[in-house]
Every structure is written in structure tokens, then in C-alpha cells.
């Protein structure tokens, strides 16, 4: 009889000079659990301590998704059972990981091939090198489940074009690989069929030549038209009041579009991004933690997560 051992959702190994962290929970698009977050943090620390590792690479075992974000369905279950200490542990460790990635002393490369949402951006955008492919799709969709853009999103979305950052935060709009480069969420576009070659070269380089290797595998991106198109889609989202932002959004998309988003989450997300200007990531994460704990108890989160993640009828009945 073969004994079955628990399957690891995160694999850590060294390939030459590259310390690899591989997400492998494909059935749920690598949605992050607390054990996964702790496994990633442990792998990161081991690679940092290993003198043979020159570069740290995080990737997915599946081409379908890099990481679909935190397991918010599980957070909803914990909330319904009043297990707020467990929720606090999840967000505490997740945000600590985001900060650790931002402070990583070795080059950190995220290979984003497929979906990257919410917590998936927390694993990638804070790193030095964010490589997207033509299959990449990035988004911060939290307001549709009655939550706020977290994992340091208030930090990185407040540091790109103001209208585009607010548009991404409030609407959960999805951007492709080239658009992610144009909006500065990603640092380069690399065709998916070139990722194996890129990884092979990263495993055989010194820290000083990593940038050159990455650029050799990068595809040129014509930024100007993409940035113009993004600004057009985000028109009006740089207004100084939420009422004006919502008016611009309503004029472009109609009342029905706004009904899909929690009014409380939209209001808090708007203020969160405006307050984040000039603040360091650590402070932004601390503010997000307080809001995340508040929204974990909010009826709009319970209802929004039900409508999007549980019943999937996408017909939320907001209480705010």
C-alpha cells in the first residue's frame, strides 16, 4: 500500500543560480491560503540565505494562472463563523510577505503567464522585475466582492497615472500583458514560448547580468498608444471627489455597471488610494490591514463573496 502524503501547493528548489518558488494549486488558480503564504515566505528566506542563489524567481506550474489572489471564499467562511483571529493571521502574514518581497535583497523576478489578480499582484508587483506574457491578465477586482484593493495596492496604484490607478482600484478592470507594461504594473513583456529559455539563462547568470538577460528576452512595447487608450478608458477617474468619479463612470458604463460594486467598498477604496500618496509601503499595508479586518465583518463582503465566489449568480444585494 502506498502512503499518501499531503500535497504541497508551493515548491521551492534551486536550479543553478536561480532560487525557484513555484505555485502549484491549479484547481483554484493558485488562490492563496495561509499555509501557502507561509510556504512562500519560508522559500524566500531560504533562497535569500543560500549564497549559491543569485536570483529569486516566482512562477506558476500552470500556464492558466499565476495567482488568482487570496482565497476570499475561505475568508468569508471564517467570517461567518466569527473566526476573526484566523482572518487577522491570514492578512498579517500576507502583508508581511508583500513587504518582504519589496525589500528583497536579491533580484526578484515574477513570471506572470496567465491570470494575476489581487494577492497575485502582491506576489509580483512589489518585486524588482515583473515579466508578463501575451497571456497575462492583471486586475484588482476586490470592490465587486465588497472588499478593498489590498496587498499594497494602495501603494502601487497611487504611484502610476492617477486616473488609471483609481480606475483599476474601483472597477477591477483587467489589463493584458502589454497594457500592464504601459501602466507600469509590469516591467517587460516576454512571449510565453520564450519563458523556458529565459529561465534557463537566469539559472546560469550572476546578479550583475540579470538585467541584460531579461532585456534580451523582452518584446518591444509601443507604449504611447497603449497609454493613450488606458487614459481614455480611465477618463474622469482622476476627479477630486468620489461623486465626480462615479458620475464619469456612470456616463461611460451606465447605472447597471455600477450596481455590481459595493458602495461601501467603492467609497473606502477611493479614500484609501487618495490617502496613500507619498506614504511608504509599510504604512499603506498597515492602513489596508485595518480596513481589511473591518470589511471582513461587513455584510457587503459576505454578500459580494457569495454572489461572485460561492453561488456565482453575480447578483449582489448590497446593504451599504
Predicted features and spans:
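Hydrophobic/aromatic residues within transmembrane alpha-helices
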Residues: 58, 71, 123-124, 179-180, ...
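Hydrophobic, secondary-structure "cap" segments at the distal end of domains
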Residues: 154-163
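Amphipathic alpha-helical blocks and their helix-capping loop/short-beta junctions
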Residues: 182-261
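Long, low-complexity C-terminal extensions of enzymes
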Residues: 248-253, 258-320
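Glycine- (often His-adjacent) and acidic-residue-rich active-site loop
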Residues: 60-93, 144-146
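Gly/Pro- and small hydrophobic-enriched strand-loop and loop-to-helix capping segments
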Residues: 128-149, 184-199
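Glycine-rich beta-to-alpha active-site loop
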Residues: 101-145, 167-168, 172-177
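Conserved CoA-thioester-binding segment of acyl-CoA-metabolizing enzymes
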Residues: 1-59, 99
Amino acid at each position: 500500500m502506498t502512503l499518501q502524503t499531503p500535497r504541497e501547493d508551493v515548491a521551492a528548489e534551486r536550479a543553478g543560480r536561480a532560487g525557484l518558488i513555484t505555485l502549484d494549486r491549479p484547481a483554484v488558480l493558485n488562490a492563496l491560503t495561509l499555509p501557502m503564504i507561509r510556504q512562500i515566505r519560508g522559500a524566500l528566506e531560504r533562497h535569500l540565505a543560500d549564497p549559491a542563489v543569485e536570483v529569486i524567481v516566482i512562477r506558476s506550474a500552470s500556464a492558466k494562472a499565476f495567482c488568482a489572489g487570496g482565497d476570499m471564499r475561505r475568508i468569508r467562511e471564517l467570517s461567518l463563523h466569527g473566526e476573526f483571529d484566523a482572518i487577522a493571521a491570514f492578512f498579517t502574514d500576507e502583508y508581511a510577505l508583500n513587504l518582504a518581497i519589496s525589500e528583497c535583497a536579491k533580484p526578484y523576478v515574477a513570471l506572470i503567464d496567465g491570470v494575476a489578480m489581487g494577492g497575485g499582484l502582491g506576489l509580483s508587483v512589489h518585486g524588482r522585475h515583473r515579466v508578463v506574457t501575451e497571456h497575462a491578465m492583471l486586475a484588482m477586482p476586490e470592490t465587486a466582492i465588497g472588499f478593498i484593493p489590498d496587498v499594497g495596492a494602495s501603494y502601487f496604484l497611487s504611484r502610476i497615472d492617477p486616473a488609471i490607478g483609481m480606475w483599476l482600484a474601483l472597477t477591477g478592470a483587467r489589463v493584458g500583458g502589454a497594457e500592464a507594461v504601459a501602466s507600469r504594473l509590469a516591467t517587460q513583456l516576454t512571449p510565453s514560448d520564450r519563458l523556458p529559455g529565459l529561465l534557463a539563462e537566469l539559472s546560469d547568470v550572476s546578479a550583475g547580468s540579470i538585467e541584460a538577460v531579461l532585456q534580451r528576452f523582452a518584446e518591444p512595447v509601443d507604449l504611447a498608444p497603449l497609454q493613450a487608450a488606458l487614459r481614455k478608458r480611465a477618463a474622469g477617474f482622476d476627479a477630486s471627489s468620489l461623486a465626480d468619479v462615479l458620475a464619469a463612470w456612470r456616463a461611460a458604463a451606465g447605472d447597471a455597471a455600477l450596481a455590481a460594486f459595493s458602495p461601501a467598498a467603492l467609497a473606502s477604496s477611493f479614500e484609501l488610494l487618495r490617502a496613500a500618496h507619498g506614504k511608504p509601503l509599510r504604512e499603506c499595508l498597515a492602513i489596508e490591514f485595518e480596513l481589511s479586518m473591518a470589511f471582513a465583518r461587513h455584510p457587503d463582503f459576505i454578500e459580494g463573496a457569495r454572489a461572485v465566489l460561492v453561488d456565482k449568480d453575480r447578483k449582489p444585494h448590497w446593504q451599504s
